[in-house]
Amino acid sequence: MDKKYDITAVLNDDSSINAVSDNFQITLDARPKEKSKGINPLSAFLAGLAACELATANAMAAAKMITLNKALINIKGYRLTNPSDGYFGLRELNIHWEIHSPNEEEEIKEFIDFVSKRCPAHNTLHGTSNFKINISVTLVH
């Protein structure tokens, strides 16, 4: 089955942005933190990536015989604000997983690799040029 994603974003008079999808709304705002009314759009993008990775892990864990007692992701992104090559996008992501599980470390690393290949957001980004994704994992027993 094909899946379609439909987002509508509206620029407000105060420069914040309201984005709506499936009757849910989020406020985004690229202004400095002291004036901001919502999450930075690029941070929201990275939050979407993290949520997609976690949802994929949750959906696939039982089939892969992985016990997820707790899972969290921290993503740090890097970009140049004044690039000499004209590329303003993210240059690098560091994705750090913290997995609480009785499984062995090698099982978890293989599982995270599998999840990253199955996650639609990660898979989309992986094919983008001028972009690097680094993944690290912390296993907590």
Curated annotation (Swiss-Prot):
Record key words, sorted: Cytoplasm, Oxidoreductase, Peroxidase
Entry superkingdom: Bacteria
Matching Pfam families: OsmC
InterPro entries linked to this entry: KH_dom-like_a/b, OsmC/Ohr_fam, OsmC/Ohr_hydroprdx_reductase, OsmC/Ohrsf
E.C. no: 1.11.1.-
Primary location class: cytoplasm
Expression induction: Down-regulated by osmotic shock and ethanol. Not induced by oxidative stress.
Cellular component terms per the entry's GO annotation: cytoplasm
Disulfide bonds listed in the record: none
Cellular compartment(s): Cytoplasm
Gene3D superfamilies: 2.20.25.10, 3.30.300.20
Single GO molecular function: peroxidase activity
Cytoplasm in keyword set: yes
Disruption phenotype: Mutant is highly sensitive to killing by tert-butyl hydroperoxide (t-BHP) and H(2)O(2).
PANTHER family with a match to the protein in the record: HYDROPEROXIDE REDUCTASE
Biological function: Reduces organic and inorganic peroxide substrates. Protects the cell against oxidative stress.
The family this protein is said to belong to: Belongs to the OsmC/Ohr family.
Subunit structure, interactors included: Homodimer.
The name this protein goes by in its record: Hydroperoxide reductase
Organism: Mycoplasma genitalium (strain ATCC 33530 / DSM 19775 / NCTC 10195 / G37)
Taxonomic lineage: Bacteria, Bacillati, Mycoplasmatota, Mycoplasmoidales, Mycoplasmoidaceae
